[in-house]
């Protein structure tokens, strides 16, 4: 530990506040809060920690702290600091999961809408609904039952909805404020849980229509009742008080936290939200940070009541969110909290089980591959592939797999420099020479296995450079494809002998992933270079276009096709003088063969 850190730790105050952990560049990498700064900050540098926390602590070279007057103030400040610095070790809930609401607009002639964006306007919002289908089914029923206007813009004449008795036609008729209010009140009653009452009213109307021999009307009312029954069946009542509430539960294991939220609306459990993230604080502190961010997210509407587990300070939550927060000791709410806790625990167990299974499969695949090839377990595998089209823009690519997983920071791209024309073998010689000469000079980690995407000639070329020129003896195998360009088998040794793997084995799947990945990486790099060269060669003969302007045009348009479709104004917008823009436009439109 740095000496200045020890000195700062020694003078930490025993007061609430926030702390900001910094790395060697001075970047804030983590923001936390504490009831007692002295105890919390010191805990990072003492005792044992899980792997994730050890990585965080390993990067800390300095910290700052801000003393606050209360835990509530610390919670508010923490959220603001996280938004300001966006530290890489803090959770940041993404605003990408939104739920649909039904909205009654505040227009003079109100409408029913489905929206995922709750605004602070005069409209009335109902929800959230678990999914778009549920919201649309409810709106469709309401549209049939209550004749609010349907059109976004008022038409000049009545539409089909009027003839279906689903609109009062305010476009051509006078619909009073009182009429609209009566309809809106009925809709609100329905959306606030008055399904049974509305159903009873419809039943009475259905029998009346039947007695009057209005069988078509009676059938329509019967269908509406059936739709209400279907909606009620999907939203079983779990609480009788009809209060909108969010019920929270959480679990912590192996440095991860899972928080589950049950959305209860009008007494019905309609949806659940699951969030999982690494945690570096005490569980209670991590939960408070989560719940603060959860309701800052515009897609999460604050209900009338928030229900939290017994370990959480409900008074602090209530003051912070300005919503009633309860900590139930018994009854249905306590049962729901325990159910949320249980679901969170199960979700974490499932996550770790799947991770362990995946790791077990990949490690076994690597181990079995080594045994099949008669070598030590190849924990680090490097694979090479060449790419060119008729010798133009020849490139090569190298990828690395460590413990059976792609290590993308280790990937490398190579422009072929010494080879003229389409010579795959010489290209392979060059790239193997460049890769491992540098590895020796810079003392970089060497692979346990090298895979060359190719046959005997490619393998011989690479082996010649590696062993005869560089004096390296690393196991090397050629990856041979079938006539459909799919993974077939490996060849290894001198002379090369085929090693056939079971096609349904994990080691064969590993080879397929390696082959697909190195090919993808090489071909993507080649296309980038080829696209640039095509554009640049197409621009070579245009007066006034030098290398600098070629780069500007390439960056702005990205492809020759887009340049050929561009107007003079768009070339000017890209930074070309008007006379040059006109020249480019004329040249590219005349050159039909480009």
Curated annotation (Swiss-Prot):
It is found in: Cytoplasm. One of its GO terms (cellular component) is excinuclease repair complex. Residues 14-91 form the GIY-YIG domain. GO terms for biological process: nucleotide-excision repair; SOS response. SUPFAM superfamilies: C-terminal UvrC-binding domain of UvrB, GIY-YIG endonuclease, RuvA domain 2-like. It comes from the Bacteria. GO terms for molecular function: DNA binding; excinuclease ABC activity. Keywords: Cytoplasm, DNA damage, DNA excision, DNA repair, Excision nuclease, SOS response. The UvrABC repair system catalyzes the recognition and processing of DNA lesions. UvrC both incises the 5' and 3' sides of the lesion. The N-terminal half is responsible for the 3' incision and the C-terminal half is responsible for the 5' incision. Belongs to the UvrC family. Interacts with UvrB in an incision complex. HAMAP family: UvrC. This is UvrABC system protein C. It comes from Bacillus cereus (strain G9842). The lineage of its organism: Bacteria, Bacillati, Bacillota, Bacilli, Bacillales. The gene is uvrC.
């Amino acid at each position: 530990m740095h000496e200045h850190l020890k000195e700062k730790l020694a003078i930490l105050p025993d007061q609430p506040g926030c702390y900001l952990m910094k790395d060697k560049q001075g970047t804030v990498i983590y923001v936390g809060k504490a009831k007692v700064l002295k105890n919390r900050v010191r805990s990072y540098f003492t005792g044992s920690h899980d792997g994730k926390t050890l990585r965080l602590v390993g990067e800390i070279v300095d910290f700052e702290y801000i003393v606050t007057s209360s835990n509530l103030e610390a919670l508010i400040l923490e959220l603001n600091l996280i938004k300001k610095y966006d530290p890489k070790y803090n959770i940041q809930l993404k605003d990408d999961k939104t739920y649909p609401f039904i909205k009654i607009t505040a227009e003079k002639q109100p409408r029913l809408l489905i929206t995922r964006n709750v605004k602070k306007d005069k409209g009335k919002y109902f929800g959230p609904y678990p999914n778009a289908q549920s919201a649309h089914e409810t709106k469709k029923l309401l549209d049939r039952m209550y004749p609010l206007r349907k059109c976004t813009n008022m038409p000049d004449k009545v539409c089909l909805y009027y003839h279906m008795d689903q609109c009062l036609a305010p476009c051509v008729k006078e619909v009073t404020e009182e009429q609209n209010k009566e309809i809106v009140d009925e809709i609100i009653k329905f959306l606030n849980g008055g399904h049974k009452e509305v159903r009873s009213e419809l039943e009475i109307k259905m029998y009346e229509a039947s007695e009057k021999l209005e069988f078509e009307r009676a059938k329509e009312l019967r269908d509406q009742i059936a739709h209400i029954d279907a909606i009620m069946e999907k939203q079983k009542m779990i609480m009788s008080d009809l209060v909108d509430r969010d019920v929270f539960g959480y679990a912590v294991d192996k440095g991860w936290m899972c928080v589950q939220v049950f959305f209860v609306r009008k007494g019905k459990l309609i949806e659940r939200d699951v969030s999982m993230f690494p945690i570096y604080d005490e569980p209670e502190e991590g939960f408070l940070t989560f719940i603060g961010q959860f309701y800052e997210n515009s897609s999460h509407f604050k209900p009338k009541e928030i229900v939290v587990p017994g370990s959480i300070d409900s008074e602090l939550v209530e003051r912070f969110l300005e919503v009633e927060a309860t900590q139930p000791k018994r009854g249905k709410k306590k049962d729901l909290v325990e159910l949320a806790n249980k679901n969170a625990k199960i979700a974490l167990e499932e996550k770790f089980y799947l991770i362990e299974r995946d790791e077990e499969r990949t490690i076994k695949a690597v181990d079995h591959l080594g045994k099949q090839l008669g070598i030590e377990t190849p924990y680090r595998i490097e694979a090479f592939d060449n790419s060119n089209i008729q010798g133009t823009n020849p490139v090569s690519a190298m990828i690395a797999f460590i413990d059976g997983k792609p290590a993308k920071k280790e990937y490398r791209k190579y422009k072929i420099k010494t080879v003229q024309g389409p010579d795959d073998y010489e290209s392979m010689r060059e790239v193997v020479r460049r890769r491992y000469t540098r590895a020796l000079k810079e003392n970089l980690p060497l692979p346990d296995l090298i895979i060359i995407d190719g046959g005997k000639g490619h393998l011989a070329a690479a082996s010649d450079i590696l062993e005869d020129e560089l004096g390296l003896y690393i196991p090397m195998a050629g990856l041979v494809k079938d006539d459909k360009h799919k993974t077939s088998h490996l060849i290894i040794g001198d002379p090369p002998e085929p090693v056939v793997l079971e096609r349904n084995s994990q080691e064969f799947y590993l080879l397929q992933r390696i082959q697909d990945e190195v090919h993808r990486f090489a071909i993507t790099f080649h296309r980038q270079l080829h696209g640039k060269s095509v554009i640049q060669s197409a621009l070579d003969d245009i007066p006034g276009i030098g290398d600098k302007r070629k780069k500007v045009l390439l960056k702005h348009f990205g492809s020759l096709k887009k340049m050929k479709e561009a107007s003079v104004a768009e070339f000017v917008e890209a930074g070309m003088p008007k006379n040059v823009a006109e020249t480019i436009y004329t040249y590219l439109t005349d050159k039909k063969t480009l």
